[in-house]
Regions:
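Beta-lactam-recognizing serine transpeptidase/beta-lactamase-like catalytic domain environment
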Residues: 80-85, 90-93, 133-184, 189-442, ...
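Small/polar-residue-rich segments within soluble enzyme cores
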Residues: 1-101, 434
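Short, gly/Ser/Thr-rich active-site loops of penicillin-recognizing serine hydrolases
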Residues: 355-364, 451-480
Length: 480
């Protein structure tokens, strides 16, 4: 080129060809990720890279960088003093051809992914859907999102600055990195643990005083609830999401042990077996373990003077407990499977490789016996079809959806809307978690979104067009 022939006049400059990515669809942005120039440390320490090379920064681009990048080729050329091409050195004897990277096949159902992204427009939160029988991630949505092509080309730095300074954090992958209180969805786990440890049976009843719900201590402290019939059994407690029931069950569970420390250690072990409090060893390089405090945390905080009622908020998924949406979806898949799961993963096939990582094909069991899941699941079904169900508006004709609403307290504004579900009840095809920040009741936003996603995936159509229109028109992002 003309410029190349003149470069000898500009010391330190050279021409270099780069292969640029193009993302033909704006869908699955947080999943796919994006490329960026390698940093100085990587360029110096990794012999594959040189300054100016591109590598994966986030998503699949980063997690499967080695599979995608291929092998570099090399061509040695002769040039004259004016940098003009004089042909190959020794007829290309030392040249090598580049080898293309592997082709990856993802687990994503692209139509479901696109639909979920439409439903989450003008909202902040996440959706994660998993196939329980395989652990394959069917959709993983973080909202708001962004156009990945903004991070390609000359204006990449300028666009990145704008995106990174956006108060709604579109670059932040809430599905993997957002840590939230699970709210009442976590009552299911506490119910399972209480059953396993004989703190309660399916016929154990607890009274609820309505507004004051569960009262405890000499000062008359309480965990509030809402007016409903009382007393309640386990299944009814799930159906109407009674705080008092699960606080009582939590206290009964603790009473089975000789000390608070012993009880909490046992509880912590059970909860951990659901993939909570750890990274789950999936095929993403980014993600957070959430927050599941150990006994030592409370021993230090309360100087050894604490009991079940001190941490009673954990009974209803509040307090120090924080989960990521992918953990909530995996928790739901475990319930759907009656006690086991496959590590959630996003890649199902890599060209040139016969099998995927065995970590993704090996069953992992939680610590709860299979027989204790049925009463929990029966209660979850009543959430959508029962007279007092908290998500009656999300039932679908001829399809048993087992779900649980959650409304998590938010110190920064409106409560968060949560819903976890799987369907159908027997031989489940999909497990899903929906989290809508500042969405209020779980039944208002999260449950309808989950129902629409389930309908789309299983029935391939939408039976409730009015509900769909309500969600599509909903705008929960406040404009300044």
């Amino acid at each position: 080129s003309t410029l190349g022939e003149s470069l000898y006049e500009f010391h330190g400059f050279y021409l270099r060809k780069l292969t640029m990515r193009e993302y033909p669809t704006n869908s699955a942005t947080h999943l796919v990720g994006y490329l960026g120039e390698v940093n100085r440390t990587k360029a110096k320490t990794n012999p594959f890279y040189t300054k100016g090379d591109l590598n994966g920064v986030s998503g699949i681009e980063a997690a499967y960088e080695e599979e995608l990048r291929g092998e570099k080729g090399m061509a040695i050329k002769l040039v004259d003093v004016h940098n003009r091409d004089q042909g190959k050195f020794q007829d290309g004897k030392f040249d090598t051809l580049p080898i293309a990277g592997n082709t990856l096949k993802s687990t994503i159902d692209i139509e479901l992914q696109k639909y979920g992204e439409k439903l989450m427009q003008n909202k902040i939160g996440a959706i994660v859907a998993i196939e329980p029988s395989t652990g394959e991630i069917l959709s993983l949505i973080s909202a708001p999102t962004y156009n990945p092509n903004l991070l390609i080309g000359r204006k990449r730095s300028e666009n990145y600055k704008v995106l990174s300074e956006d108060e709604n954090k579109p670059l932040f992958n809430r599905a993997l990195q957002g840590t939230y209180p699970p709210g009442s969805t976590f009552k299911l786990i506490n119910g399972l643990i209480a059953l396993q440890e004989k703190g309660i049976t399916i016929n154990t009843n607890f009274n609820c005083t309505g507004d004051k719900g569960y009262t405890f201590g000499i000062k008359g402290r309480f965990v509030g609830c809402h007016p409903h019939t009382t007393p309640l059994s386990l299944k009814k407690g799930i159906e109407i999401s009674c705080n008092a029931y699960f606080c009582g069950a939590y206290d009964k569970y603790f009473s089975k042990f000789n000390s608070t420390v012993e009880a909490y250690d046992n509880w912590h072990s059970h909860v951990s077996s659901f993939g909570i409090g750890n990274y789950m060893n999936n095929d993403f390089i980014s993600g957070f373990p959430g927050k599941l405090p150990k006994t030592s945390y409370f021993e230090k905080l309360y100087r050894g003077s604490w009991n079940a009622n001190t941490v009673i908020s954990m009974a209803i998924g509040q307090g120090e407990l924080l989960l990521t949406p992918i953990q909530m979806a995996n928790m739901t898949a475990i319930i759907a499977n009656r006690g086991f799961y496959y590590t959630p993963h996003i890649i199902k096939e890599i060209s040139g490789q016969e099998n995927i990582d065995t970590n993704f094909t090996k069953k992992k069991y939680c610590s709860i016996e299979a027989k204790y899941f049925e009463p929990i699941i029966d209660g979850m079904l009543k959430v959508t079809i029962g007279e007092g169900g908290t998500a009656q508006n999300s039932q679908i004709a001829n399809l048993d959806i087992c779900g649980k609403t959650g409304t998590a307290q938010n110190p920064h504004g409106e409560d968060h809307s949560i819903f976890i579900a799987f369907a159908p009840k027997d031989n489940p095809k999909i497990a899903i978690a929906v989290y809508v920040e500042k969405g209020g009741w779980g039944s208002t936003w999260a449950a309808p979104i989950a129902s629409l996603m389930i309908d789309k995936y299983i029935n391939k159509n939408i039976s409730n067009s009015h509900q769909e229109r309500f969600i599509l028109d909903g705008n929960l992002i406040t404009e300044d």
